[in-house]
Amino acid sequence: MASNEGVENRPFPYLTVDADLLSNLRQSAAEGLFHSFDLLVGKDAREAGIKFEVLLGVYTNAIQYVRFLETALAVSCVNTEFKDLSRMTDGKIQFRISVPTIAHGDGRRPSKQRTFIVVKNCHKHHISTEMELSMLDLEILHSIPETPVEYAEYVGAVKTVASALQFGVDALERGLINTVLSVKLRHAPPMFILQTLADPTFTERGFSKTVKSDLIAMFKRHLLEHSFFLDRAENMGSGFSQYVRSRLSEMVAAVSGESVLKGVSTYTTAKGGEPVGGVFIVTDNVLRQLLTFLGEEADNQIMGPSSYASFVVRGENLVTAVSYGRVMRTFEHFMARIVDSPEKAGSTKSDLPAVAAGVEDQPRVPISAAVIKLGNHAVAVESLQKMYNDTQSPYPLNRRMQYSYYFPVGLFMPNPKYTTSAAIKMLDNPTQQLPVEAWIVNKNNLLLAFNLQNALKVLCHPRLHTPAHTLNSLNAAPAPRDRRETYSLQHRRPNHMNVLVIVDEFYDNKYAAPVTDIALKCGLPTEDFLHPSNYDLLRLELHPLYDIYIGRDAGERARHRAVHRLMVGNLPTPLAPAAFQEARGQQFETATSLAHVVDQAVIETVQDTAYDTAYPAFFYVVEAMIHGFEEKFVMNVPLVSLCINTYWERAGRLAFVNSFSMIKFICRHLGNNAISKEAYSMYRKIYGELIALEQALMRLAGSDVVGDESVGQYVCALLDPNLLPPVAYTDIFTHLLTVSDRAPQIIIGNEVYADTLAAPQFIERVGNMDEMAAQFVALYGYRVNGDHDHDFRLHLGPYVDEGHADVLEKIFYYVFLPTCTNAHMCGLGVDFQHVAQTLAYNGPAFSHHFTRDEDILDNLENGTLRDLLEISDLRPTVGMIRDLSASFMTCPTFTRTVRVSVDNDVTQQLAPNPADKRTEQTVLVNGLVAFAFSERTRAVTQCLFHAIPFHMFYGDPRVAATMHQDVATFVMRNPQQRAVEAFNRPEQLFAEYREWHRSPMGKYAAECLPSLVSISGMTAMHIKMSPMAYIAQAKLKIHPGVAMTVVRTDEILSENILFSSRASTSMFIGTPNVSRREARVDAVTFEVHHEMASIDTGLSYSSTMTPARVAAITTDMGIHTQDFFSVFPAEAFGNQQVNDYIKAKVGAQRNGTLLRDPRTYLAGMTNVNGAPGLCHGQQATCEIIVTPVTADVAYFQKSNSPRGRAACVVSCENYNQEVAEGLIYDHSRPDAAYEYRSTVNPWASQLGSLGDIMYNSSYRQTAVPGLYSPCRAFFNKEELLRNNRGLYNMVNEYSQRLGGHPATSNTEVQFVVIAGTDVFLEQPCSFLQEAFPALSASSRALIDEFMSVKQTHAPIHYGHYIIEEVAPVRRILKFGNKVVF
């Protein structure tokens, strides 16, 4: 204590204060200061500065660090003065541990006593402060004041110097507190780790991979359930106090109460003298909440030492040992205790000198501190935040944490036949049961809808539409799979034009029946498709927009290639089932205001007609003779009317319903009561339905123009002029070459017609009968004598532009007819020469002895024509047959096939292989599409017609088998070929990987229930998977065909609690060292260095930390989506006008501004200007992962990897990168989290998949995503493996320290926080490779019900779902006066 006598008598009076050692050091320090003034002599400022160092040294020697002793933080320390600290170099202290044993009475051999020497590392800490003293003040101190003014200056100088010195001392005091707190944090693992690993239930089983898996599960459970427990308690209602006590008690129980200083208890409660078991270091807000929840003891003081003990090193080595819980300072002390007096009981009084000399003589004073009672423990609670706030320094217990959230958009529930809600009265209209948006709540309780419009900046970017990176990844991998496709990869050009020979040669003695991957996928349900046993197919399902296959390059090496799927309908059936396509069709109906013209009766009539085995074969003869010529139809109106009326009256079915041209002519020319009114009404409805569908498609596409082309061809394949109808009677090929800019090629046999200048070489124009009268003889001669097999000219009528008639025809053949008939049809080739002979070469047709009105059957001899008429149950007149025979005058000789190849549109031609940028189709020239034949019909017509299976919709094997015996034999040998999607068609006519329509569409057509919904569904299946299509569908809220997983990372400001048990750290305080840093003319600067050291004295982890409350959420938790046009500005489609249109529509390009900074071509990333203002905080960036619509909704209801497959492999045995990569990427192994499947999203979880190439930085040649990428941590392979390795090492390291008795483990193990723990605490999602479900619902009604404060709510309402938020942060949701926690 300083005495008043120590102050010199001066003329100016001085104020003296009480010397309180624990609260004020100024007076004791000033005593040395004032006595040292005599040492300063002379007037030279520099000399004075040198001499003042002596004064400063005397002053700093008086530093006692009493402020630290006043803090409750000192409860967890044994504080000792160690003047020889600077001489300590070894930095290790040894402790002796005896392991207790259990005596058994079952005859087991007694255990020997085991004693271990545990080494504790001593860590040095250096703190320093700087003090600057003015030379003018020092000179004034040297002067002798004589006047009152000089006295005042003298006193002011003394105060200034003393204040500067006190400033430095205060900084050192704070530095000690900060050092101790840092030491505590270094030894304080997170609560969710420590609580799990400290549980003997786990640790006593060892640490096999099974146990590690359990540990990770417990990590996640504790993280979710116990983080931010004060926020949970606020809204818990009754029981909150017990809940908070329980959480705090768990913290106390999780740490080790064992210490090598067992007998030391330097802090006790003022009332009762109960030892203080530890201290909670908290923030101010947490302190207020704790005291509000729990209250504090009546006596809010604790008793503690008023000074430091003294630590003296004696002997060559310092050995501190623990024996039977007693502390010993030296081996001599150990020998005296154990050998000389082994039965003498030790006490605190006798043990303390072993640690520090003079402890028993330390005075004890009361210290103000909050104390709470947890069970039988009294624990101090203190906040040190004010000290950090005063110094404008960050408080170590305030942390920034990042949590990743995810939610799905657009998932399809296959059988939404029920609801769990009794409150929602949503219209149960099926059109509303396919979700197209997700409703979420931002941090300010604003309800937001994330829909397709928000995702356009990702979905419309070229990176999503290119397979180049995917193919590079596959080709860089080891050898491709063993099974390689050989069938249907490429079209094979025939060297002749005889289609009958092509079909005969293909099916004759054909035994092999390969099935394409596309077809194999169609036959699998979603569960089987995603099963590990299906890895052979799954491994190439990497991109939603591309079918990937293995081809061969010029060197005959196997190379992966990709062809665009073009339309939504070509998505694999397991990932886009039929029910989903129909739901899209219903959305299409609603969005485009489609009012169907046909009714179910018309559809059923068409279906009955298609499956009528007695369908009159003579109708095909009539249709062949007319073959799309309106003039010939008018010539044969009586016969056509007879056919329609007879078939309608006899069977109630529609004739010629298989031909668009016939229906069109019937509607145009037979409306004058020539046929039955009911039948005509049905034809009109069919034609009206085509018009309605065409208008709906036009409303979907809009009226925009891109360049000189309508945007419709980019939106829907039916509006694309490059897709031709499957049957041609007029010269649509030359018209295509004229209007298309996509390099069309008309492949006729082995010739290519690609230039309209070559039209005379390939097209033989056939005009009206009057025009062709002069050529009848030449035509006859050609039919009889021509080399038809090698004549590559096509006999076609002139193309007639009738507005949108081409679109109507395509809708008929690609939508209406296959849907209503279940694609139960096949192409039909016609031998016109034999048909003409059948019709004309008979008596009534030639002879003038028969009048036109006579019934031809009454005068017809036995023959093919009679058989045809009889099985068709027709009785035409002689005149009708004559007119029909006359129609043959301009008929071709045979049906031919033409292969049409065109470039994909510019948004779909990003495949690297030129051949894969084109799409092909086969067009039947002067042929028909027909229904199945009966046995009787085939016997009669086998010389007239032959099967041509040329298209997915017009190649039903069951129908073809009724027309061709070789096909029937082939199908019988290979029963699996009965499926439309699997049926092998001649490669000269069909190559599935090049077709517009592929197996999924064929399977849908074959299996759908003919209905209005199916028609709408098939129409919607023709919508393209292109940026323009996504833009159009976003505008009308139509599902794009794929779902999305939205990933967002939010930042949380958390306030944490640190608990440290008593005497868990020994702090050694050395002596200060003063040095002059700088001496100037006007001032002198000194640095005071102080050396300290710390030793962790716990026998395990004696401190822990856990998040207590959320101070703030800094991000908005909104729907701001990553702009890929800013992230990857250098990538573009091949047409600048298309690029500009897309950017303008998605909002990535502002009109009237500089379109592109030239520097971005080098840097790879544009400067993104933020919003001018923010209302909800920093915008959290959302990123999109394209996901199959069949993804399991339950997957998103708990924390999982957004990739779709678990990526946390800490549970594996000896960690190595190969094993880790196998568990993460090898889909032949089950998902570790869901062993019944490999993945929930093959488009994101596999190496080289779309999600992988979008967010794995190894594929980014130019830049990483914008300012922040929430998906990068889940996809970047290097970062993912690094986090896995870090978590694996972390669990192993903690397990080493906590897996058994400390003494039996490595004696060099130190109980410190393992590297990476801070990252684990602040970014747990990166380590666990999981994102937390965010509150979202596919319908706002479900959110409203969730907010209705009911005990239960509706997780499912038909096709809609709600996903509750399961995250460490428990938000309070408030809409109006409704509150949900």
UniProtKB/Swiss-Prot annotation:
Keywords: Capsid protein, Host nucleus, T=16 icosahedral capsid protein, Virion
InterPro entries registered for this protein in UniProt: Herpes_MCP, Herpes_MCP_upper_sf
Subcellular location: Virion; Host nucleus
Domain of life: Viruses
Gene Ontology annotations for the cellular component aspect, listed alphabetically: host cell nucleus; T=16 icosahedral viral capsid
Pfam families: Herpes_MCP (PF03122)
The UniProt record lists the keyword Transit peptide: no
Keyword Zinc among UniProt keywords: no
Gene Ontology molecular-function annotations: structural molecule activity
Chief place where the protein resides: virion
Family under the similarity heading: Belongs to the herpesviridae major capsid protein family.
Function: Self-assembles to form an icosahedral capsid with a T=16 symmetry, about 200 nm in diameter, and consisting of 150 hexons and 12 pentons (total of 162 capsomers). Hexons form the edges and faces of the capsid and are each composed of six MCP molecules. In contrast, one penton is found at each of the 12 vertices. Eleven of the pentons are MCP pentamers, while the last vertex is occupied by the portal complex.
Subunit comment: Homomultimer. Makes the hexons and eleven out of twelve pentons. Interacts with triplex proteins 1/TRX1 and 2/TRX2; adjacent capsomers are linked together in groups of three by triplexes, heterotrimeric complexes composed of one molecule of TRX1 and two molecules of TRX2. Interacts with scaffold protein; this interaction allows efficient MCP transport to the host nucleus. Interacts with capsid vertex component 2/CVC2. Interacts with the small capsomere-interacting protein/SCP.
Protein name as catalogued: Major capsid protein
UniProt source species: Epstein-Barr virus (strain AG876)
